[in-house]
Amino acid sequence: MNGIQWIIDNKDTAWAGVDESLHGIDIISLSWGITSHEGGGSDGSDMHSMILDVAMEEGIVVSVAAGNDGPNNDGLSGMGSSDLSITVGATDDGNTITRDDDTIASYSSRGPRRDNGDGNPLNELKPEVTAPGTNIIQAEGCVTSGGCNNLLGGDASSNTYTSRGSGTSYAAPAVSGILALMIEANPNLTAFEMKEILKFTAERKGEPTQPDVDPFWNRDFGWGLVDAYEAVKLSIKLRDQGLNGLIDVNTQVHVESSSIDNQSGLYVIQGIAWGQMGSVNAIEYRINDGEWMSVAFEQTNGSLSALERFSWSLALDLDKISMANNSIEIRGLSDDGQSLPITITIQGYGGVSDSSESFIWDLLPNTMFFVLFIIVGLLLWNSRTENPEALFLDSNDSIAKVLKEDKDLASVVDAELLEG
């Protein structure tokens, strides 16, 4: 506790003899489990978990090992149960360089965390991510010849590597290394943006364990196996677009599939969206950094509540898009900011448009080459099934009126209400 408090107290300390960019402390990598002395493990209210929450809130991103109690573990220990920290499970890569055969390590503790009774099912979804933790070669820690005594302050410059080891204590430092790369790429990322980027870019593994709460989280892998390349790439994108501090980590927009529809010939991107703590106000897209195009919709029976999902589908006529790599960017908007952006690269068949604006003005009357459907899903975490809410344009007349009055919406040619 005192050690973590010292880190928090020195998060901005100007260390002597180093450049200002190296001042303070940015990351905690923790492989220390605390027995909670409770059946079912900790619910995150123990003092060790709570001080890690404070560290995250102070801007220090925390990577903490999930534990090594295997699939039948009795919950997670203190620290690994922290509401806000990044809890890390371990995978076994089978001694291959491919990721397809990676499995959850037999020893890796599984989720979820014990319920703390606060009515929010999201903070029980532990671990957040997984990383390689099996048969990992380790740096030599000894600083003297002979016995390994790890003298503090000793000269370890001649140390090499020693034996291999396994455990979530090897996975958590790997995630800490990725976090360091993300900070190097974008020093202005917040701790919560980094956590969300890791979850968002992770390679999905396993079937969803609690699909009514989250459609991707799995009790073994969390939101998936970390992808360092994609995490750093998205960090750079946020830097280049000036999005630091503008990301609402509770606004979720995800692509589920993208391919050419054989019947229509259109390139179709399908996905889902929802708010974890509120509602999604709009979904927008743009082409090649052009203007953002919004989707008009009306809401029935009030606003969508937290965790209520809807599906969206975007269809593009490739004949209207230039024969080059074109960037399609999609985002969701809420009262508190925007979701992490999704970028898909497609190649057109020969049009000359290179921006959202020119793409719109190529629209021909009565030609439906771009379609954006908004459909409310009936996936409610609180098991509500009556009177599902819908996003819709109520008639063809309404559509025509919208297109006439708002040219920014000219590419929206249809939307229909689906009743549950």
Question: How should each PLM-predicted stretch be described?
Answer:
Residues D26-S31, D53-M56, V61-A65, I86-G89, ...:
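Structural recognition of the beta-strand scaffold that forms the well-ordered cores
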Residues I247-F359, F370:
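Long, low-complexity serine/threonine/glycine- and acidic-rich segments characteristic of extracellular
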Residues F373-N387:
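Alpha-helical transmembrane segments
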Residues M1-G39, G89:
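Subtilisin-like peptidase catalytic core
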Residues V18, I25-S29, T160, E184-I260, ...:
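C-terminal subdomain of the subtilisin-like protease fold in secreted/lumenal serine endopeptidases
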Residues T385-G420:
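Cytoplasmic C-terminal tails of single-pass
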Residues N68-L84:
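Glycine-rich, charge-decorated loop segments at or immediately adjacent to ligand/cofactor-binding or catalytic sites
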Residues A14, G80-A180, E184:
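Extracellular S/T/G-rich loop segment that most often corresponds to the catalytic His/Ser-adjacent loop
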